[in-house]
Amino acid sequence: GGVSVPGPMGPSGPRGLPGPPGSPGPQGFQGPPGSSGPMGPRGPPGPPGKNGDDGEAGKPGRPGERGPPGPQGARGLPGTAGLPGMKGHRGFSGLDGAKGDAGPAGPKQMGPRGLPGERGRPGASGPAGARGNDGATGAAGPPGPTGPAGPPGFPGAVGAKGEAGPQGARGSEGPQGVRGEPGPPGPAGAAGPAGNPGADGQPGAKGANGAPGIAGAPGFPGARGPSGPQGPSGAPGPKGNSGEPGAPGNKGDTGAKGEPGPTGIQGPPGPAGEEGKRGARGEPGPTGLPGPPGERGGPGSRGFPGADGIAGPKGPAGERGSPGPAGPKGSPGEAGRPGEAGLPGAKGLTGSPGSPGPDGKTGPPGPAGQDGRPGPAGPPGARGQAGVMGFPGPKGAAGEPGKAGERGVPGPPGAVGPAGKDGEAGAQGPPGPAGPAGERGEQGPAGSPGFQGLPGPAGPPGEAGKPGEQGVPGDLGAPGPSGARGERGFPGERGVQGPPGPAGPRGNGAPGNDGAKGDAGAPGAPGSQGAPGLQGMPGERGAAGLPGPKGDRGDAGPKGADGAPGKDGVRGLTGPIGPPGPAGAAGDKGETGPSGPAGPTGARGAPGDRGEPGPPGPAGFAGPPGADGQPGAKGEPGDAGAKGDAGPPGPAGPTGPPGPIGNVGAPGPKGARGSAGPPGATGFPGAAGRVGPPGPSGNAGPPGPPGPVGKEGGKGPRGETGPAGRPGEVGPPGPPGPGEKGSPGADGPAGAPGTPGPQGIAGQRGVVGLPGQRGERGFPGLPGPSGEPGKQGPSGSSGERGPPGPMGPPGLAGPPGEAGREGSPGAEGSPGRDGSPGPKGDRGETGPGPPGAPGAPGAPGPVGPAGKSGDRGETGPSGPAGPAGPAGARGPAGPQGPRGDKGETGEQGDRGIKGHRGFSGLQGPAGPPGSPGEQGPSGASGPAGPRGPPGSAGTPGKDGLNGLPGPIGPPGPRGRTGDAGPVGPPGPPGPPGPPGPP
């Protein structure tokens, strides 16, 4: 054979086309959740959130138990006298009270008898005046001796009305007689037969005017009559002093947020008071409501995309990855629904306003914490038990006083009671002539308070009264004692954890070094998925540096490197509060660092010793008003003010509804008798009054003339015994019986409640006094002991799974992976088609010619089947970290992270030195006129004035209204039972009774 000569190497073939992408490998198992990272430092507070919508009104809470009585409230200013009310309807007659036992006998001593004056001729009777308001029932005086009854005279003829005689001069006042011992009641005399009515006499001639008689000496004090029925309640007096504040009731559940009241007009600034002594350190207040969440920073800048790697062949299925680090603690879920509001507690009595406390010091700002890198979300944990209740929040500042509400509509009338049985009506006698006004007896012993009377019928609703003038603000009271520390409240339920959001593209491998921040570049194409990076070790938390003085807020600069931790320094004195600086620009959010494992909770250190007071600082600006302090101690009662001049009578106000019947107070001491004033001039006739409400039933008129004698009828059948008649009208008191006055007995039982009487006319309004000067600000109280820190409650249970979170930002493009090993050559392809024959060449020389040039390559054959996947190449060493890419555009804000735990309360700062006294403010506008002062004690009786000349006869006034019925006399003898009357028509059906017991 011939020697085979190797020909020259042919040109390299064209590069093969890349094979199809391999199918994705099976998904790896999710690793167990890693341990929670350490809690980052507390970030700065976020901006205040907007007010949420008003919640629904809570159900009324249960009435709170009445607490111990609070300290005595300061004496309130006397209220403004109300407008005179219209005369109310006549109340029902009260039941007669039980007769009290006679009191002990006083010393019997006769006073000198005055000289009797000449008896003047009686003048003509004037028109009956309208009945005044009944005053409080006076103490019953001892009964005096009653003169013997004269023989009954025959009814004379009605004389003509004589002219009014001149007024007699008042006699000199005799010495007051000694109170005599009450005599025993005499036996009741037998009722005499009723006399025939006399015939009407002829009208008598007009009598001449009599000469003025000399006023007689005052007689002995009359016998003490029986206690009259309780008179109608007088007009409501001025508002009394505020009572002692009641103990605060148990705090009910928080009700629904009410609508904000209208903002009051800001008053003029008051003068700056002296800085008070440093107040006691208050107990640590309860944990306040969490502030609104701060804005979450945008995602970090996106790096440059890596170069596109060459798609290698499909690798074998990957091994199960190692469990990833524990995800951070899930964010708290939504707050639980508020519980139903409890019934409102009993309203406590109004206490005196406390003085505002001293302004607190502003602590130095803490170092800003760095945000930890959020880990993958862990599975939702089991729901924990409810924590203990947290401390109640601090008392907020007093809000603006709301407007006075409009007067409510009167309630519906009560159910009609069962109809009572009607007794026989007793005959009402004609009213007797008015006797001379007796002197007021000495004060008797105070009787036991009677039962409350039955409520009178509701009067027509009165018109709304005019708003009263605002009173003068009172002086600031002394600061109250520091309140007790409240209990720590239960922590709220843990919110529901939301499901983890869809996983973003896998991130970079090993973390690179932070380079200088460049300008934002255009986003590149997404790179291929790189290998997972190793989690770095968490760094140690540096100690907080010394807080410097608070300066003006500057523009936010770039974030610098963390400094070396310094030692804890001594807390400096709080400097003066500077003026607010301009708001700085918001800085870019830094890169999120890796989260380290949670460290053990350190033990709480012991409180440090109290430092020495520092040098005095300059006076700070006036702080906001402090919270309402505890009511101060009751001050000593002030001296009674002088009685002001009587003001003009106010216009008559509308009739108000009858108020509740108050207990009858003890009668006051007898005042000295005043001197008689000169007779007044005849007044002008008054204007026609408004038509008042229907008056009470008038008294029975005098008996009419006797009618003709009727024929004697036949004796009818005896009727059935009728119902017991009502007690008859009280007859006139009988003459006193013989015997000595007995000693007074013990107080009798309390009488039955009286009925409400008509509302009396209010007195004239006094002159409004000038507002007093505003008192200086009181010193704050001494600091109290600091309370013990509360114990941390158990962690709450994990909430239910929440809705899926938003899609996270795309991860950074990883570096290109290494090219895989070259695959094994594929199978040989089928031979290609034969080429077309070439042009016929020249005939060659005889013999073997030189080897011809290689022919052109044939057309590529069809693609052969895909070769088998080669073995997965080993991971090569990590290349050096490339330079940091420029910062990408800021992404959308991510979801809010969980709120950090509240740090421990810092140590108490040193006590500040008393600042300089501020300058007095401008004098405010004059306050509204104050309420009239209380009526002073009655002055001593002055000497009797000289006798004045007789006044001229006045013009007769208009006919007055029917007078009110007189007091009920002592009970008369019981009348005989009358014959049974005809059966009346059936009454209306009564209201249905209450349901019986089950």
Swiss-Prot record:
Cellular component (GO) terms are: extracellular matrix; extracellular space
Q: Spans of biased composition, class Pro residues? A: 142-154, 648-660, 803-813, 848-863, 983-998
Lineage: superkingdom: Eukaryota
Among the Pfam families in the record, one is: Collagen
Q: According to the UniProt entry, which residues carry 5-hydroxylysine?
A: K87, K239, K314, K559, K670, K840, K902, K914
Expression tissues? Expressed in bones.
Indicate where this protein resides in the cell.
Secreted; Secreted, Extracellular space; Secreted, Extracellular space, Extracellular matrix
Asked whether the keyword Calcium is assigned, the reply is: no
* GO BP term, example: extracellular matrix organization
Q: Which InterPro entries match?
A: Collagen (IPR008160), Collagen_superfamily (IPR050149)
Indicate which residues are glycosylated according to the record.
Answer: K87, K914
- Which residues fall in a compositionally biased region of kind Gly residues? 294-303
Q: Which residues carry this modification: 4-hydroxyproline?
A: 18, 21, 24, 33, 48, 63, 69, 78, 84, 116, 122, 143, 152, 155, 182, 185, 197, 203, 212, 218, 221, 236, 245, 248, 260, 269, 284, 290, 299, 305, 323, 332, 338, 344, 353, 356, 365, 374, 380, 392, 401, 410, 413, 431, 449, 455, 461, 467, 473, 479, 491, 500, 511, 523, 526, 532, 538, 547, 565, 580, 607, 613, 616, 625, 631, 649, 658, 667, 679, 685, 694, 703, 706, 727, 736, 744, 753, 771, 780, 783, 789, 804, 810, 816, 825, 831, 851, 854, 857, 929, 932, 950, 965, 971, 986, 989, 992, 995, 998
**PTM comment for this protein?**
Contains mostly 4-hydroxyproline. Proline residues at the third position of the tripeptide repeating unit (G-X-Y) are hydroxylated in some or all of the chains. Contains 3-hydroxyproline at a few sites. This modification occurs on the first proline residue in the sequence motif Gly-Pro-Hyp, where Hyp is 4-hydroxyproline.
Compositional bias (Basic and acidic residues) spans?
51-65, 899-913
Protein keywords: Extinct organism protein, Extracellular matrix, Glycoprotein, Hydroxylation, Phosphoprotein, Secreted
| Modified residues annotated as Phosphoserine in this record | S93, S595
Complex formation: Trimers of one alpha 2(I) and two alpha 1(I) chains.
Q: Which family does it belong to?
A: Belongs to the fibrillar collagen family.
This one is known as Collagen alpha-1(I) chain
Organism of provenance? Glyptodon sp. (strain SLP-2019) (Giant armadillo)
Question: Source organism lineage?
Answer: Eukaryota, Metazoa, Chordata, Craniata, Vertebrata
